[in-house]
Structure formats: structure tokens, C-alpha cells
């Protein structure tokens, strides 16, 4: 079972305790933050602060120590100052996300933000801030993947690699993409894989054995 996404306010200790207790629930949580600045979060009407969000991250680490965490981040929301942008970067350093979905703010007519606030951040500033967020996330993703080298992971093989029909691609229970040599393995197999190499987006490994689940 793979958890999809949750508003941080719904990520209670009770939910995390249950997720950590059952082996058939994946070690992966998508917990959107949007911004690392409490003042920006207030303007977004997100109903939580930076501190409250980080408390939920700490709870995830407590109940699910090996859990991979992803998020959504928006650069250049209405009125965002450079200091508020730096708060987002510092939150990223504190959490060290495995994956992030990153965008710059684009006004949508009819939304609360469009009604209440002016889209006043110049596009070149939005793009520069987004580039800084992406660069930091790329560093963190590579860091998280390097931590996996030498470990053994259970991988569900999902499809043939685009670059070679002699490779298969699967995912760990932490939602990390793993590439293996096809050999006698088939799509749909669960296999134990020793991770040997990585990029910031992909793990590579050798199959040790097939797993029957």
C-alpha cells in the first residue's frame, strides 16, 4: 500500500503509528509544505506554520525512521520577500527531502490568492528563486541516493527501461526508482536488490534473489 498525499494537518501521530506498524505500507509519505516561511503560509491560508510542519516531519522520523519524504514547493508567491525565500531553502536543508515537486507561482483567476493578493513578484525573480530551490533539491536527492549504496532493497519490477530492453525498472517501498539487468526477471516480480550506484534520480543495483510475497 503506497500513501499518496496528505494535508499536514491530517498527519497525526495515530496515522503514523499505524503506518509504521504494518510492513505492507510503503515507507513513503508525500507531505506538501508549499513554503518554508510561516508568513507566506499564512497568506496561502495553509492553516499551519513552519514550526508545526517541522513537528510533523519529526513525528514521521520517530514512527517511520526509514521513511522517504516528498513535498510540493512554490517559489514567488504573492509578496514573498527574499528573506521568506531563504526560509524555504533553510527548511529544505532541515528536512532533506527525497523528492520535490517544484513550481513558481502563477495566478489562477477565481482563487482566494487571486482575490486577496497582487501577483507582484517579477517573473525573472520567480524563475531565479525556483532555480535555487531545484538546485538544492538536486543536491539533497543525490545525498539521499548515495545513502542507499550498499543497502539491500525489496523492489517491485514495473516496466522495461526506455534506454535498453535488457534492463528493467522498479520501485522500492520508499518510492525510489531502481534499474537492474533483465536476466531472467520479469515485470511484476519482487526481487531483493543490492544497490551499487546512483544518480540524483535513479538507483542501480544487482538482483540477489526473487522474493515471494
Predicted regions mapped to residue ranges:
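Conserved, mostly hydrophobic/aromatic
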Residues: 3, 31, 72, 92, ...
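Flexible glycine/acidic-rich beta-alpha junction loops that bind and position SAM and/or redox cofactors
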Residues: 10-14, 33-44, 75-82, 98-124, ...
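Short, hinge-like loop/turn segments at secondary-structure boundaries
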Residues: 19-20, 88, 118-121
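Terminal RNA-binding accessory module
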Residues: 113-213
Amino acid at each position: 500500500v503506497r500513501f499518496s498525499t496528505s494535508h499536514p494537518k491530517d498527519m497525526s501521530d495515530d496515522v503514523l503509528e499505524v503506518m509504521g506498524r504494518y510492513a505492507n505500507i510503503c515507507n513513503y509519505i508525500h507531505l506538501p509544505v508549499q513554503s518554508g516561511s510561516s508568513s507566506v503560509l499564512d497568506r496561502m491560508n495553509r492553516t499551519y506554520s513552519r514550526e508545526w510542519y517541522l513537528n510533523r516531519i519529526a513525528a514521521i522520523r520517530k514512527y517511520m525512521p526509514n521513511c522517504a519524504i516528498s513535498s510540493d514547493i512554490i517559489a514567488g508567491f504573492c509578496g514573498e520577500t527574499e528573506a521568506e525565500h531563504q526560509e524555504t531553502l533553510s527548511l529544505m536543508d532541515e528536512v532533506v527531502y527525497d523528492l520535490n515537486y517544484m513550481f513558481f507561482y502563477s495566478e489562477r483567476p477565481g482563487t482566494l490568492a487571486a482575490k486577496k493578493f497582487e501577483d507582484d513578484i517579477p517573473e525573472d525573480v520567480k524563475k531565479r528563486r525556483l532555480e535555487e530551490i531545484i538546485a538544492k533539491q538536486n543536491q539533497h536527492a543525490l545525498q539521499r541516493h548515495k545513502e542507499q549504496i550498499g543497502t539491500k532493497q525489496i523492489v517491485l519490477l514495473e516496466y522495461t527501461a526506455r534506454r535498453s530492453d535488457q534492463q528493467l525498472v522498479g520501485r522500492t517501498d520508499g518510492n525510489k526508482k531502481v534499474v537492474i539487468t533483465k536476466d531472467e526477471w520479469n515485470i511484476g516480480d519482487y526481487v531483493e536488490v543490492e544497490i551499487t550506484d546512483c544518480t540524483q534520480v535513479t538507483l542501480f543495483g544487482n538482483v540477489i534473489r526473487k522474493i515471494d510475497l
